[in-house]
Regions:
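Short, glycine-/aromatic-enriched active-site segment of Class I SAM-dependent methyltransferases
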Residues: 200-223
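N-terminal auxiliary segments of SAM/dcSAM-dependent transferases
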Residues: 2-53
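Conserved Class I S-adenosyl-L-methionine
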Residues: 245-311
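Class I SAM-dependent transferase core
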Residues: 41-88
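Class I SAM-dependent methyltransferase SAM/SAH-binding core
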Residues: 98-155
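Short alpha-helix
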Residues: 224-240
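A short glycine-rich, Lys/Arg-flanked "PGG" loop and its adjoining helix->strand segment in the class I
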Residues: 179-194
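A short acidic, Gly/Pro-enriched loop at the edge of an enzyme's catalytic core
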Residues: 154-165
Length: 311
């Protein structure tokens, strides 16, 4: 189902006024922020440091919006999203996988246990996440199959034709740029190899304008990455990929996030909140009119693409 990108004018201007007020009240801070370079690693380091359970393997450290079609808990929904991406990637025994932007590697642990992936190499630019993820992998006894290191998805430190599969679970919108990542992914995949990406982007019809630029900056999203699903597919084609598929899962992500942020604002831990879209579904528009506007994305898709096989 195609999403409609425009929101009611009164909501649009309410949101714009909220940004304008920030510039009026804190002009020096806001201008300085907009002039800074992208600090994705700093953003996620600060988020991690606020978590009291960071070193406790009994508390999963998922960092995605989740797939809430049947799940009602945050950790369950995040695991469901990882499983959905595994389906799209067609992960199986024998695969040698590169996972970029792996967060705390929860999905890598799941894919080894449930999909029996032979080996996973993970790249992540946030050093604290790499350190904690290595610790969690070691405690799980899987350090021989999951190797994690600091590294960039736009400058992958491996030779061409190195991997059967390549995954990016809800991180590619941060890459500077996503197109550079596409080029690198194509290079390091073996002929016939498969790329699978869970990604957030503007809905079809949303204006790519000044307001989106400001919100993108606040979310550490390089503005060249802000394009809709149709342009996304064209860019994959441009970099040589074939058999491209795009599966929208917005209806099972964003409505749940309306509830998520409402409960978090009440002081409920993400490990304790309960969301049941079967009983209370606010719909996609509830997200797009509010947080989706400020967070600079309101479409969610799973993309898959293949590097052509050799003749």
């Amino acid at each position: 189902m195609e999403n409609i990108g425009k929101i009611p004018l009164k909501d649009e201007w309410r949101n714009r006024w909220a940004i304008i007020k920030q510039f009026i009240l804190n002009p020096v801070r806001e201008m300085a922020f907009l002039q800074d370079q992208f600090q994705v690693s700093e953003l996620y380091t600060n988020i991690a440091k606020r978590d009291p359970h960071l070193h406790d393997p009994n508390f999963p450290q998922w960092l995605n919006f989740g797939y809430w079609k049947e799940e009602t808990t945050y950790n369950g929904a995040c695991a469901a999203l990882a499983r959905k991406l595994a389906e799209v990637a067609e992960l199986k025994a024998g695969d040698h996988l590169l996972d970029v932007g792996f967060g705390f590697a929860e999905q890598d642990l799941l894919w080894v246990r449930e999909n029996n992936v032979s080996s996973i190499i993970g790249l992540n630019t946030t050093e604290l996440q790499v350190e904690i993820a290595q610790e969690r992998v070691a405690k799980a006894g899987l350090s021989d199959r999951i190797k994690l290191q600091v590294g960039s998805a736009t400058q992958i430190p491996f030779p061409e034709n190195s991997f059967d599969k390549l995954t990016a679970l809800e991180c590619a919108f941060h890459f500077d740029t996503r197109e550079d990542f596409f080029a690198e992914a194509f290079r390091v995949l073996q002929p016939g190899g498969r790329l699978a990406v869970a990604d957030c982007l503007p809905r079809v019809g949303r204006e790519i304008n000044f307001w989106l630029r400001v919100n993108s900056k606040k979310m550490c999203i390089p503005f060249p990455n802000q394009y809709d699903r149709h342009t996304y597919v064209e860019k994959l084609k441009k970099h040589g990929f074939v058999n491209i598929q795009a599966l929208s899962i917005s209806e099972y992500v964003w409505p749940a996030m309306v509830h998520y942020f409402a409960q978090i604002s009440q002081g409920i831990s993400k490990h304790d909140l309960v969301i049941d879209l079967q009983k209370d579904n606010p719909g996609l528009e509830a997200w797009s009119r509010n947080r989706g506007w400020f967070m600079a994305f309101d479409d969610y898709l799973l993309f898959s693409a293949e590097k052509p096989k050799l003749n």
